Amino acid sequence: MAPGALLVTSQNGRTSPLYDSDGYVPAPAALVVGGEVNYRGYHHAEWWVGNAKQVAQFYITRMGFEPVAHKGLETGSRFFASHVVQNNGVRFVFTSPVRSSARQTLKAAPLADQARLDEMYDHLDKHGDGVKDVAFEVDDVLAVYENAVANGAESVSSPHTDSCDEGDVISAAIKTYGDTTHTFIQRTTYTGPFLPGYRSCTTVDSANKFLPPVNLEAIDHCVGNQDWDEMSDACDFYERCLGFHRFWSVDDKDICTEFSALKSIVMSSPNQVVKMPINEPAHGKKKSQIEEYVDFYNGPGVQHIALRTPNIIEAVSNLRSRGVEFISVPDTYYENMRLRLKAAGMKLEESFDIIQKLNILIDFDEGGYLLQLFTKPLMDRPTVFIEIIQRNNFDGFGAGNFKSLFEAIEREQDLRGNL
């Protein structure tokens, strides 16, 4: 071991070198992690976008986020700018290049920045604005990373420590479906606003002083769309490399309309704090919403992120007041739902009339119910959107709403000429 190598002790009690003077010291190929690694939840989602500052402002003014940290020319980042916004437990990072990808520009960049700049421009050209990375906070980065790589995951960055005056953070990253990545984050002693290298935002955005608040709790789940016959391989990756299990699934018999269909499997971390639904298209008369996404995103990627709220009526009302556009649900859905709720003896705490007025969808079983609503796509490409969700003793994913939801999205698809 090289002098000065950093040692990290994993949950199984094994002390390993994280890196030495020549770089990361890889784990044995046959490594099996002892014990179950604890996933703490989603740490953040990073979006690669054309103009990070403007996109951050959209989430601040439209969705009630607050600016918490940034990185850019002012902090010594010469080629990229990142703006971090947060709403309670929901963190989004928006990153853009601030220099051209022209060769003469790249000559001045370190090799790592050259590669990242090239990748970012390729990503923006291929996908448009989209989610590049979904980051998980874990108790043991070393164990999660080693287990993933030993079971076939492709490394993006090996475990390393970033330090600043506010403490240390250990992180690593792997590839998942398409061009999407997962970063593992372990906040060992860190007390800062986001991650080392970011500067805290000290002022509150003035727009939020004049707009109704939006109370979000956390990222509930993050959905990935796959191309034809790719769902099984994606789910196998989460089982094999990350120790996830199949939590819930529906097939094309359950999610179909007159024109199109899809299949979906929800993958969950062992402790069920992280859930990653995986969709793929199924055969129908016309193009499904999954096919439309894959066509315009040019491959698999994150379709939507569900944000949990304790009060969806207040959240959706205030989001609408701020200018957020949601899908429309026909009155016939609510006529049928009122009868279903009455037949099942299910009583909602919320006013049914207000739920209908706001176009909120309802699903339920004998134990509880779920309220949810979906925004329209957030950019001109019909790709990524946001879900607002409230759970009342209900762990499902709105299977009872899939047909109505699919039909609502198809109406938007038809307006775009993509059905």
Swiss-Prot record:
GO terms for biological process: L-phenylalanine catabolic process; tyrosine catabolic process. Pathway: Amino-acid degradation; L-phenylalanine degradation; acetoacetate and fumarate from L-phenylalanine: step 3/6. Its EC number is 1.13.11.27. Residues 41-187, 218-376 form the VOC domain. Keywords: Dioxygenase, Iron, Metal-binding, Oxidoreductase, Phenylalanine catabolism, Repeat, Tyrosine catabolism. Its cofactor is Fe cation. It catalyses: 3-(4-hydroxyphenyl)pyruvate + O2 = homogentisate + CO2. Fe cation binds at residues 221, 304, 387. Binds 1 Fe cation per subunit. InterPro entries: 4OHPhenylPyrv_dOase (IPR005956), 4OHPhenylPyrv_dOase_C (IPR041735), 4OHPhenylPyrv_dOase_N (IPR041736), Glyas_Bleomycin-R_OHBP_Dase (IPR029068), Glyas_Fos-R_dOase_dom (IPR004360), VOC (IPR037523). GO terms for molecular function: 4-hydroxyphenylpyruvate dioxygenase activity; metal ion binding. The keyword Oxidoreductase applies. Belongs to the 4HPPD family. This is 4-hydroxyphenylpyruvate dioxygenase.
